[in-house]
Swiss-Prot record:
Its EC number is 7.4.2.-. It is found in: Mitochondrion outer membrane; Peroxisome membrane; Postsynaptic cell membrane. GO terms for cellular component: mitochondrial outer membrane; peroxisomal membrane; postsynaptic membrane. It is a single-pass membrane protein. It catalyses: [protein]-with a C-terminal TM segment(out) + ATP + H2O = [protein]-with a C-terminal TM segment(in) + ADP + phosphate + H(+). GO terms for biological process: anatomical structure morphogenesis; extraction of mislocalized protein from mitochondrial outer membrane. This is Outer mitochondrial transmembrane helix translocase.
């Protein structure tokens, strides 16, 4: 083909139009190649749809909490999907009963330094702690306190899940771990909450997988290491019912620890009063009697007890309706009486005692009321 082109045409310089045309063709070819390769790579990536959804959700959450104009990496976008808007949390301090002392300490230690930072800027001793640990038996209100803290503080809140930091590709877990703290710094003041922290940051041993050990080490380094600023407004809050399984280096980074133990009789009465508030109760209700007979019960147990008691009136109503239907089959000439299903009898003391007996049988079957099973593990 080149032999058909005159020699003079090959040797002469290109005209302006020919240069522009060549550049246009090269640009179009390069763009087509780039987008073709990108389309193939995206099509082969099984997580592409998940990443796209995560990006949309992260942008929506960032807008809800009032963070705009902040550039996030791909890994920070994944962590941003775990953000919680404090305004969407329905739990307040009024929903926590029997823990007045802990609530007061939480307000002074955690919430006040974030809300009144100008009062604490002149002293290193008045800086908020880097970490806070809530520990105690299950069902005693640790997670409830964390929710109320997030609501009251008004800080950005990351509800971190351990599964979010695990990835099958080598090195990805470390990048996600780094993104947790880089995102928290960008949107500070921020609280990073780890529920059941013992399952993620448990005691290290030689049996740990290399990737897991590296992830724990990086988490601690970013949390409180050489690069950590003294004026950082990032706090890690954890909750566990097995503090003895949490690594010692993690406990060192959580100098402020609150023991949320089983409620005493007075606290149980207060919890029962809160749970039953707004319910249709009989005037003969004696919550002090129920509280005195529920030794070793957690707040979660008391809520289940009240739920069972409320169900007894529903069962009575259903049985009465069934008996009326049977009677109407033999009295077809009489007009059927209309009964409003919302009109249930009040919860009585007998209902609560029945619920207490049922809960006691359940706990005896699982041996959860045995004092040996309820002993507290000291937090060193």
């Amino acid at each position: 083909m080149l032999s058909d082109i005159p020699r003079d045409a090959l040797l002469r310089p290109l005209t302006r139009n020919e240069v522009v045309g060549m550049l246009v063709r090269l640009t179009v070819f390069g763009a087509a190649t780039y987008y073709s390769i990108k389309w193939v790579v995206d099509a082969l990536d099984p997580t592409q749809k998940q990443k796209s959804q995560a990006k949309k959700r992260a942008e929506q959450l960032m807008k809800q909490i009032g963070v705009e104009g902040v550039s996030l990496t791909e890994y920070e976008m994944n962590i941003a999907t775990l953000l919680v808007d404090p305004r969407s949390i329905k739990v307040t301090w009024r929903d926590v009963a029997g823990l007045d002392e802990i609530i007061s300490e939480m307000q002074d230690t955690v919430i006040l330094p974030f809300q009144k930072r100008h009062l604490f800027s002149g002293s290193k001793l008045l800086q908020p702690p880097k970490g806070v640990l809530l520990y105690g038996p299950p069902g005693c209100g640790k997670t409830l306190i964390a929710k109320a803290t997030a609501k009251a503080s008004g800080c950005r809140f990351i509800n971190l899940q351990a599964s979010t930091l695990t990835d099958k590709w080598y090195g990805e877990s470390q990048k996600l771990t780094a993104a947790v703290f880089s995102l928290a710094v960008k949107i500070q003041p921020c609280i990073i909450f780890l529920d059941e922290i013992d399952s993620f940051l448990r005691n290290r041993s030689s049996m740990d997988h290399e990737a897991t050990a590296m992830m724990k080490a990086q988490f601690m380094s970013l949390w409180d290491g050489l690069d950590t600023g003294e004026n950082s407004q990032v706090m890690v809050m954890g909750a566990t019912n097995r503090p003895q399984d949490v690594d010692a280096a993690i406990l060192r980074r959580m100098p402020t620890a609150f023991h949320v133990g089983l409620p005493n009789a007075a606290q149980r009465e207060e919890i029962l009063r809160l749970i039953l508030s707004g319910e249709n109760l009989s005037n003969a209700i004696n919550l002090k009697e129920i509280a005195s007979q529920s030794e070793g019960y957690s707040g979660s147990d008391l809520k289940e007890l009240c739920r069972d008691a409320a169900m007894y009136r529903v069962r009575d109503y259903v049985r009465k309706q069934q008996m009326k239907q049977i009677a109407q089959q033999f009295q077809l000439d009489e007009e059927e009486e209309h009964v409003d299903s919302r009109q249930l009898r009040p919860v009585t003391q007998l209902d609560l005692l029945f619920g207490l007996d049922k809960m006691r049988e359940s706990k005896q079957a699982t041996a959860t009321t045995d004092p040996a099973n309820l002993r507290e593990v000291p937090l060193d």
